[in-house]
């Protein structure tokens, strides 16, 4: 069982127990967050949202914050001896997917990934 969720403009394919790095959140480590924009629930009977699946949500536990890889920006002006080298490291929040809930009545869904194919 997997789900496609949307969080602040990014889409993620998530499964239960998976660790995921999302854009920085103002949340304490150990707290639970809810990803409500579920676009698709995959499994034996996939459900596609229009645009979201009604009543579906993904609950995740915040593990902490991390920094991404450094991006180096180098600017220069040709023939003028002007050079500037700066770097940037984006901060992310690492979360662990606790459960995928399909219906609003808190029905917890479990399932295996056997027999499913990756469309990518």
From Swiss-Prot:
SUPFAM superfamilies the record matches: L21p-like (SSF141091)
Keywords: Ribonucleoprotein, Ribosomal protein, RNA-binding, rRNA-binding
One GO term (biological process): translation
Keyword Lipid metabolism among record annotations: no
One cellular component term from this protein's GO annotations in UniProt: ribosome
GO molecular function, one term: rRNA binding
Oligomer and partners: Part of the 50S ribosomal subunit. Contacts protein L20.
Similarity annotation: Belongs to the bacterial ribosomal protein bL21 family.
Job description of the protein: This protein binds to 23S rRNA in the presence of protein L20.
Protein known as: Large ribosomal subunit protein bL21
